[in-house]
A protein has these predicted regions:
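C-terminal long alpha-helix characteristic of the crotonase
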Residues: 226-227, 258-305, 475-481, 510-551
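Active-site proximal loops enriched in glycine and acidic residues that flank catalytic Cys/His/Asp
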Residues: 310-313, 352-354, 382-384, 404-406, ...
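Short glycine/threonine-rich loop-to-helix capping motif typified by GTGT followed
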Residues: 359-364, 502-505, 547-549
Length: 593
């Protein structure tokens, strides 16, 4: 018995000591992560900035210490960090050029165009840009086409096949589950409900998707033609041939690439360009290094601030606990009120990258934008898309900027309700009864997001009238903000999606250009020359992140890596449970291949 107690006591002490040791090691590791994230990067002479793309692109990214602690390699980049890093590389004399290494990046063409334009600006410094890949995906080739020299592996390939979209339809799946979908909408082109009630695109939806694709493809052709000096007709003919499976030598003959090299030869070439000896190592700086490089410009002392408020993701009245990358209506309204009352903030650039969401929430944000504009200029910069609710929250701004390939418009709303009467009674064996004092007292009775019975004719009429009123309000908001007649807005509304280039011609957008142009316009309208730029909402520090929703961030990043281009479709379905029934949402997933 005595020996047993000794053994038990020793085991308990061992477990406690092991726990203490692991806790100490965890704290040391965390402190190391924090220290490394805050340490200023020292740039060596003859350095090269390496744009090594692999992963996904967002407007902004939050540091994920849990992912770092677990040693995960999945990368997520913030567009804001990339654009700032390219600017720093241009201004830093020790950085001789940029090496684009485009493995894979899940990004829209609007974001790629912003990066591409930043690289064009970088080239004005006279520094070199070299691109090399084993296989160039089409989007990555579009980005890389700005390079002075495009190098491809002798066994490599270039994706060049045109633009396409492939929506997914769930009607048969919904039917097999025993669900009935009831739809209420305004607008011939408001086709967000189609995946649940059809098995193919309607003629109107096919029309708008085709025209948007052609507009985006036209921009891609024009940009690549300008950089590679290949006629657009020739580039289009190449796409018809589906160039992805050509021999590498053919890309040289077609002038899509400049030369063939293996990776070791590319490294030697980069050493020559940057002034390094063959036996030296490249002085390489990656995005995570450039974030901590000090800006090579004098610090502004004016006290003037231009706030850049990032509004990206679905517009949700009450985001669920597992929801991230969304616009929390209550939080954004509160933040805009704070910016309104901050006298140091002279102007606000509202960076919108949203397919829309709650119609009610969109109107609440619209109201705060109007109030903000009463005190200081508000300039909208549209990202990948600012459609439906995303356009709703933008339309009141002083000026609107969009990239040519931005997807915007979609002025319209819809409602969608799910009835599970067949699922509940025939499949699950559930029955429902009701007592009520008034005719429609049980309207909306449900289990979770699914109604226990479908709406009858009078209830459907009630819902449709509600949607009609919401659409009329949306049109009036746009007419007021854009200083156009309601008749003019109605001609370009009907839920139709437009590219930025098309929207400018229609008066829905003021100018084409990225966030830099929007910042310049904000400074001009505010009448200031010297200012600092501060991003909002403020990012969490690493300790707050670790104590907050890191499990959620980690799980979402893993799902994003696994699903790839289907992640947006997954998020749209997931957010159905968080959304109210009346939506101002883009009619399709803007995933252009």
């Amino acid at each position: 018995m005595k020996d047993f107690l000794k053994f038990t006591f020793a085991s308990v002490i061992g477990v406690i000591l092991a726990g203490v040791v692991f806790t100490i090691l965890g704290i040391i590791t965390l402190v190391g992560i924090v220290a490394s994230s805050d340490t200023e990067t020292v740039v060596k002479d003859n350095s090269i900035f390496v744009l090594d793309f692999k992963g996904s692109l967002s407007e902004r990214v939050q540091e994920n210490p849990l992912q770092q602690l677990l040693g995960e390699e999945f990368e997520a980049y913030g567009l804001d960090d990339i654009l700032a890093s390219i600017k720093k590389a241009k201004d830093n004399d020790k950085i001789k050029g940029i090496y684009i290494q485009p493995s894979y990046l899940e990004a829209s063409y609007a974001s790629l165009e912003e990066i591409r334009n930043a690289l064009l600006d970088f080239k004005e410094s006279g520094k070199f840009i070299v691109a090399y890949a084993d296989q160039y995906a089409q989007g990555m080739y579009y980005l890389s086409s700005v390079a002075d020299k495009i190098i491809i592996n002798p066994q490599g390939s270039i994706g060049w096949h045109g633009a396409g979209m492939q929506p997914v339809f769930f009607k048969n799946l919904v039917s097999k589950l025993g669900l009935e979908v009831q739809v209420f909408r305004v607008g011939t082109y408001k086709s967000a409900v189609e995946p649940f009630i059809a098995t193919e695109m309607s003629p109107a939806n096919r029309e708008q998707m085709t025209e948007c694709l052609e507009s985006v493809w036209h921009r891609i052709l024009a940009d690549v033609s300008d950089s590679r000096r290949i006629p657009t007709d020739t580039l289009n003919a190449y796409a018809d041939r589906y160039m992805d499976f050509c021999q590498a030598e053919e890309y040289i003959q077609c002038k899509l690439a400049d030369t063939l090299m293996y990776k070791d030869e590319v490294i030697s070439y980069l050493k020559q360009l940057s002034g390094r000896d063959e036996n030296d190592k490249l002085n390489s700086l990656f995005i995570e290094d450039m974030i901590n490089v000090k800006k090579d410009v004098p610090k502004d002392k004016s006290g003037n601030i231009i706030a850049v408020y990032y509004a990206y993701g679905e517009i949700l009245d009450a985001p669920g606990s597992s929801t991230e990358d969304c616009i929390d209506v209550q939080k954004m309204c509160k933040d805009l009120r704070k910016l309104r009352d901050n006298d140091d903030v002279k102007a606000v650039v509202l960076r919108v990258n949203s397919p829309g969401g709650s119609a009610y929430g969109s109107d609440q944000i619209w109201r705060e934008v109007v109030r903000l504009k009463e005190k200081k200029p508000v300039i909208v910069s549209m990202g990948d898309y600012a459609a439906s609710g995303g356009y709703y929250i933008s339309c009141a701004a002083n000026r609107i900027f969009a990239d040519p390939t931005t997807l915007t418009g979609s002025i319209g709303i819809f409602g969608m309700m799910y009835s599970g009467e067949k699922l509940f009674t025939e499949t699950l064996g559930l029955n429902f009864d009701v007592v009520k004092t008034n005719k429609m007292a049980d309207l909306g009775a449900s289990l979770g997001p699914v109604l226990t019975r479908p709406l009858n004719a009078s209830e459907q009429e009630l819902m449709q009238n509600y949607v009609n009123r919401g659409y009329k309000l949306f049109v009036n908001r746009c007419a007021e903000g854009r200083k156009m007649s309601t008749e003019a807005i109605e001609k370009v509304a009907e839920g139709r999606v437009w590219t930025g280039a098309m929207a400018k011609d229609l008066g829905l957008v003021d100018e084409l250009g990225g966030i830099d142009k929007a910042l310049n316009a904000a400074a001009t309208q505010a009448g200031i020359e010297n200012y600092s730029i501060i991003g909002y909402p403020e990012k969490e520090n690493i300790f707050a992140s670790l104590l907050g929703n890191q499990k959620k961030h980690y799980i979402n990043s893993e799902i994003k890596e696994y699903l790839g281009s289907y992640y947006n479709s997954f998020k749209a379905l997931e957010n159905i449970k968080d959304a109210n029934c009346i939506q101002a949402r883009m009619p399709f997933d803007p995933n252009i291949q």
